[in-house]
A protein has these predicted regions:
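Amphipathic alpha-helical interface elements
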Residues: 1-154
Length: 154
């Protein structure tokens, strides 16, 4: 398992969760963001959401933690018009979705202890940095680069 990539993906997700919440709150004022996102999830993702929500309610955790990589992809596809506003155009939104799909695949491999090729690792780091650039999140880009440098340090 690539520990640096796993750490970078975790950090990336922590930054993206508030982004999703902010976009939903901005575009659907007066509606709970959880309900807006939940309504767009597939049946299977809704089932997983419910299980996670029950566990979260027991532990008193933050509902933002219900957002995972699978939900990021669903969010970007289901709320593409809103994503277009955030990233500046339809082509950029399509790239944003592709980057998230790439990251979801890398995250799944990391989570299931499957080996990633050096190319897959580079693509995952690149996808995180490209999303950070698209969203003008300089701190995210810098942190991903720092984690990546640690990976390549002797």
């Amino acid at each position: 398992m690539n520990t640096s990539l796993f750490n970078a993906l975790g950090y990336f997700l922590e930054v993206m969760r508030p982004f999703v919440v902010d976009v939903l709150k901005k575009n659907f004022p007066g509606e709970p963001w959880e309900g807006v996102l939940y309504a767009k999830l597939s049946y299977d993702k809704q089932r997983m959401w419910n299980i996670s929500a029950d566990n979260l309610a027991t532990s008193g955790g933050d509902t933002k933690n219900l957002i995972d990589f699978g939900n990021l992809v669903s969010f970007a596809i289901s709320f593409k018009d809103q994503v277009i506003q955030e990233v500046g155009g339809k082509q950029e939104a399509n790239r944003f979705i592709s980057y998230l799909q790439e990251l979801q695949a890398a995250r799944n491999k990391c989570q299931h202890y499957q080996e990633l090729s050096s190319t897959e690792v580079e693509m995952a780091f690149g996808s995180m940095k490209m999303i950070a650039i698209m969203l003008e999140l300089e701190d995210l880009k810098n942190e991903i680069e720092r984690i990546q440098r640690e990976e390549n340090a002797p």
